[in-house]
């Protein structure tokens, strides 16, 4: 799985856990095992706008992995579409038209891929 991707300015833990969970069995423990301490000034989400940009990068990177099962590939595409929509909504709110157009094009392409696969047009 490698280590944290140091090329990502943020969400490198998200990227790592995506890769780990894609290829290893992970189980749910219904018990609090840590105390989350968020919202402080040093938090990267305070430093970078649109944190989902880095999550989109991580999901796109995962899609390039040839070892991803068909089911997990489709689920990754669905999550990528969801994250793109979050960014599109934020971009519209902030009037980032070029950003929105680029992401909307990518989202539409992924929706077509999923639709074609559902309809057997691969």
Regions found by a protein language model. Give the residues of each.
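Amphipathic alpha-helices of TPR/Sel1-like and other helical repeat/solenoid scaffolds
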Residues: 56-63, 87
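Non-catalytic, C-terminal membrane-associated alpha-helical segments of glycosyltransferases
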Residues: 49-54, 74-122
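Conserved nucleotide-sugar donor-binding catalytic segment
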Residues: 1-58
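Short, solvent-exposed, charged loop/turn and helix-capping segments
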Residues: 65-72
């Amino acid at each position: 799985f490698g280590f944290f991707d140091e090329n990502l300015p943020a969400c490198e833990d998200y990227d790592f856990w995506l890769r780990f969970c894609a290829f290893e069995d992970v189980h749910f423990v219904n018990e609090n095992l840590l105390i989350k301490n968020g919202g402080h000034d040093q938090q990267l989400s305070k430093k970078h706008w649109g944190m989902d940009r880095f999550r989109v990068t991580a999901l796109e990177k995962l899609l390039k992995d040839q070892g991803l099962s068909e089911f997990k590939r489709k689920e990754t595409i669905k999550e990528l579409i969801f994250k793109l929509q979050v960014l599109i909504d934020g971009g519209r709110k902030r009037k980032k038209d070029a950003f929105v157009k680029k992401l909307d094009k990518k989202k539409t392409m992924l929706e077509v891929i999923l639709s074609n696969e559902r309809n057997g047009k691969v």
